[in-house]
Structures are given as C-alpha cells and as structure tokens.
C-alpha cells in the first residue's frame, strides 16, 4: 500500500474528531447565553417593583382635599373636621336660643356687657360723689356719714345714718355731731342755747345714745 492510501483513510477520522471538539466548545457558550437571559429577567422584575414603590397610594380628604399616604392619617384628619363642625353647630344653636346673632366663637365686649377700664374710670370721675353715702353703695359708716348722738334719752326725734333732718332739741341739751372723713373723725359740740359753756370747771364729757 502506498502512503497516499493511508492519508486518504486517516482524513475522515480526523475530520470527525475536529467536529466533535467544535461541538464541545459550543456548549459552554450556549450555557453562558442562558445565564445572561436569566439575569436580565431578574433585573426587569427589580425595576418593576421599584416603580410600584415610587408611586404609593394617595388618600384625599373629603372636606379640604388634603392628601395623605395612609388611611389611618386620613381617618384622624376627617374626625377632627367632624368635631369642629359639631362644635360650630352647637354654638350657633346656643346663639339662637339666647337671641344672639353673632358668629360662633366671636364675642365682643358690648355683647357680654363689658366695658373698658378707662371708660369706667372716666364715668366714675365725671359723676360727683354725694356728701352722704347711699346704703346700696357703701356701709353705714362709710365716708362723710353724719352720726347724731343725743344726750336726751327721751328725745322725740330719731336720727339714722344719712338723715338730713334738722336737730331740734330742748333747751340746754347739747348735741354732738360726729362726721367720719377720710382723715379721721370731726367732733363738733352744738348747744341749743348759744353753745357749750367753755368756762365751766367740770364739763360733761359723757355721751348718750
């Protein structure tokens, strides 16, 4: 046999080996491509989840259209609106019962019968105070209240604090008028016949009611 025949016989075998080696090399490449596809699919899932988280659900208030991101916050906000409206309705109802037509939660000094401090001071200074105090403003022994003390127990005239009647007594019956002032007490002895005798050695200093 010649060398050309041996070369022709070995050529198909060698070709078959080369083809098998090429197939073995192509297998890892196909596996690598499949792995890349799986990674791409997971990446797409992550992007979808992030998009859903970026756009959360929004709840809007029925009264003021304010937006909230949780139903609990929206419920508390709307409950506050309901309480506010209930209080406003109650105030309006009370105003109608008492005849006031003012807005709720708005009170003025004129509606409550109040007067400023300066106005009260001006009103007090503009009116002169009487010399004799009145019973419904001051007590019995207030400022400038005349008190009459009679020495005669059997006198017919009865004097009460604040009386303006003239003192009419019998002869030689002294009357002491005591007027309380801011500085103290003023004592004035008055006698029916010319006053009290200052030259007497033993004056009568006893007071009788």
Curated annotation (Swiss-Prot):
Q: Where is this region: Disordered?
A: 1-32
Keyword terms of this UniProt record: Abscisic acid signaling pathway, Metal-binding, Nucleus, Zinc, Zinc-finger
Record's protein name: Zinc finger protein 7
The principal localisation class reads: nucleus
Subcellular localization(s) per the UniProt record:
Nucleus
Give additional notes from the record.
Answer: Seeds over-expressing ZFP7 are insensitive to inhibition of germination by abscisic acid (ABA).
Superkingdom of origin organism: Eukaryota
The job of this chain, per UniProt, is described as: Acts as a negative regulator of abscisic acid (ABA) signaling during germination and early seedling development.
One of the GO biological process terms: glucosinolate metabolic process
List, alphabetically, the PANTHER family matched.
OS12G0581900 PROTEIN, ZINC FINGER PROTEIN 4-LIKE
Please name the InterPro entries in this protein's record. Answer: Zinc_finger_protein_7 (IPR053266), Znf_C2H2_sf (IPR036236), Znf_C2H2_type (IPR013087)
- MF annotations from Gene Ontology: DNA-binding transcription factor activity; protein heterodimerization activity; transcription cis-regulatory region binding; zinc ion binding
Entry's Gene3D superfamilies? Classic Zinc Finger
> Where are the zinc-finger regions (C2H2-type) in this chain?
59-81
């Amino acid at each position: 046999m010649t060398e050309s025949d041996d070369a022709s016989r070995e050529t198909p075998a060698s070709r078959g080996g080369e083809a098998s080696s090429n197939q073995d090399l192509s297998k890892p490449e196909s596996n690598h491509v499949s792995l890349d596809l799986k990674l791409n699919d997971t990446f797409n899932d992550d992007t979808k989840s992030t998009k859903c988280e970026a756009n959360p659900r929004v709840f809007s208030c029925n009264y003021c259209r304010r937006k909230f991101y949780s139903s609990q916050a929206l419920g508390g906000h709307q409950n506050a609106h309901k309480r506010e409206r209930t209080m406003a309705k109650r105030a309006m109802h009370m105003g109608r019962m008492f005849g006031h037509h003012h807005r709720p939660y708005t009170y003025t000094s004129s509606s409550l019968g109040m007067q400023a401090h300066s106005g009260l001071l001006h009103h007090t200074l503009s009116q002169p105070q009487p010399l004799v105090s009145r019973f419904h403003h001051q007590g019995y022994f207030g400022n400038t209240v005349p008190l009459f003390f009679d020495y005669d127990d059997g006198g017919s005239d009865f004097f009460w604090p604040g009386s303006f009647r003239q003192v009419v007594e019998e002869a030689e019956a002294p009357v002491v008028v005591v007027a309380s002032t801011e500085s103290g007490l003023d004592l004035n002895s008055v006698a029916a016949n010319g006053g009290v005798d200052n030259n007497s050695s033993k004056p009568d200093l006893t007071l009788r009611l």
